[in-house]
Curated annotation (Swiss-Prot):
One Pfam match: GAGA_bind
Entry keywords, A to Z: DNA-binding, Nucleus, Transcription, Transcription regulation
Cellular component per GO, a single term: nucleus
Highest taxon in the source lineage: Eukaryota
Basic residues bias locations: 48-62, 190-211
Protein name from the UniProt record: Barley B recombinant-like protein A
Low complexity bias (residue ranges): 68-77
Length: 341
């Protein structure tokens, strides 16, 4: 059983060497050290075919690692391979490096999607191709990994393009602000329209004139009392005689047997305080429709009262005496809801 647990079984196919100088020959002269292992050197077929053509044999040093790799199942050490074996004359120009690796080594050193690489190594003046042995796999130089070789070949192709240059405005770095320096908030610049105009100067307010003192002694700032207009002179001409109704005494009503003064109603009209069209009593009862008010008595308008005066003046009645309106109330009824207290 070999170092890579391959059971000395070779499954790879070997073909003739392609054209030389493929750019894969990394080292021109490498001495055959103790780590060098000949590919397919133990094959009985090749040993039988080319044993007679080998003039002399090369001595291969024994190493304890080779004994451990060729040990039997019981743990016993197998003897080293005979020194009489010679490298085959059949050229082996290239070997598969990762094909002979153990699955655990492949997981440690390679990604499962990486492709297999073929390496061609030329050693010596006779251009004989020898596959060097390394714990990584056959056909590789000790200490060299397949991925490193591939990176050396693809370095000029895998260089990333230079990043695009940013515009000058973005490259300008913001000014550094110290921690202890207080930040002063500057007001925003005025608008374009305001830049062309001159700032307005506030006008000076005119001083107020002091109010002159009043004649009645009231303070000057006190509101003036509202004056009432001249009182209208309610007068009428009856039979060529001017009468002032303001000087005529208040009419009365004697429907209850006792004279009761009437109430003013409207502009120059009168209202009874003791009788309605159905009731004649003093005082009138309280209204059931309006709280706090009494039933309104019979009414007489200003025009109707004027006609009464004209009639009495024609008969020679003295208007300086109170007029009894008991017989002059309207018989059809003109009562309205008027508050009488």
């Amino acid at each position: 059983m070999d170092d890579d647990a391959s059971m000395s079984i070779r499954w790879g196919g070997f073909f003739e060497s392609p054209a030389r100088n493929l750019g894969l020959q990394l080292m021109s002269s490498v001495p055959a050290e103790r780590d060098t292992k000949q590919l397919l050197s133990g094959s009985p077929f090749l040993h039988h075919q080319h044993q007679q053509h080998v003039p002399h044999h090369h001595h291969q040093p024994h190493h304890p690692r080779d004994c451990g790799a060729n040990g039997n199942a019981n743990g016993g050490a197998m003897p080293p391979p005979p020194a009489t074996e010679a490298p085959p004359s059949m050229p082996m120009n290239f070997a598969r490096s990762d094909m002979w690796m153990h699955p655990q080594q492949q997981q440690q050193h390679h990604h499962p999607r990486e492709h297999k690489a073929l390496h061609n190594l030329t050693v010596g003046h006779g251009s004989s191709h020898i596959a060097h042995h390394d714990p990584v796999g056959y056909g590789m130089i000790p200490g060299t990994h397949t991925l490193q070789m591939m990176q050396q070949q693809t370095e000029p192709q895998l260089q990333p393009p230079p990043p695009p240059q940013q515009p000058k405005e973005e490259c300008i770095s913001s000014p550094l602000i110290e921690e202890n320096v207080p930040v002063i908030d500057e007001p925003p610049p005025p608008k374009k329209r305001q830049q062309g105009r001159q700032p307005k100067v506030p006008r000076a307010k005119k001083p107020k004139k002091s109010a002159a003192p009043r004649e009645d002694g009231a303070p000057p700032n006190a509101p003036a009392p509202r004056r009432r207009g001249p009182r209208k002179n309610i007068g009428m001409v009856i039979n060529g005689i001017d009468l002032d109704l303001s000087r005529i005494p208040t009419p009365i009503c004697s429907c209850t047997g006792a004279p009761q003064q009437c109430y003013r109603w409207g502009a120059g009209g009168w209202q009874s305080a003791c009788c309605t069209t159905t009731i004649s009593t003093y005082p009138l009862p309280m209204s059931t429709k309006r709280r706090g008010a009494r039933i309104a008595g019979r009414k007489m308008s200003h025009g109707a009262f004027k006609k009464v005066l004209e009639k009495l003046a024609g008969e020679g009645y003295n208007l300086n005496n109170p007029i009894d309106l008991k017989t002059f109330w309207a018989k059809h009824g003109t009562n309205k809801f008027v508050t009488i207290r």
